Structure formats: C-alpha cells, structure tokens
Amino acid sequence: MTTIKATKGEFVNMINGLFAVQELKGKKFSLTVSKNIVILQKALKELEEAGRPSDKFMKLAKEVNELANLNNEDSKAKIDTLEKENEELVKTRQEQMEIVKKMMEEEIEVELNSLEEKVLPEEITAQQINNLIKIIK
C-alpha cells in the first residue's frame, strides 16, 4: 500500500487513468487496478455528488445540445433564448461548478494499492503509465 497526498483533481486524473487501463490483461494488474478504482471512488464521492447537475439542468442541457446539433441559422438565437429563460438555473449550475473547482484543489491523503513494475502489461503505453506513476513501485 502507498499513501499518496494529492489534490482531489490529481486523484480524478488518476482514477481516469485507472479506467483507461482496466481492459489490459494480467490478473494481478487487473485486481490492483480494480481495487484502486473502488478506493478512489469512495475518496471522491463527495466531489462527484457536488458536481452532479440537477434534473432540471440536465433537461435544459439536452435541449441546448439538440438545438446545437441542428446547425440551423436560428439555433444560436434559440439557445440564447433558452438560457435567458432559465437564467437562474444556469447561474446555479455555474456556482455549483465553482464550488467543484475549489474542491478539486483540496488536498487529501489516500492509501492505494501499489502496482509493481513486473505486473505491468507489455502493451501498456507511456501515456497510461504517466497517469499511474505515483502508485508504481
């Protein structure tokens, strides 16, 4: 086990790196990756919940995306109108994202399972290793 002190944002990058390599083969490697994903999901649960958009905002975002995908001349105007009609909802989401941004800068300590170099799959890339470097021994 390795205790790592880092920002929540750095741990988000690490969990994304773990998700990116979970298809690689190797029993010990896969087991360690899976265990670390579970540990990081627990450590970042508060961050995930803080960033979850409301159902109302998700509905608005869907409408905006549908309009944007139409590529009509009046799509932009319709999007602007929707955003103005839902100004408070958009403002609340922006404030929510500011809170999440601050949370991403908070430092925490997490104890993760180490990955030994000898269990790294042959097909792992340097880019994938860079996301996991803090837990490789």
What do these predicted ranges mean?
Residues T2-K137:
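A composition-driven surface/loop motif
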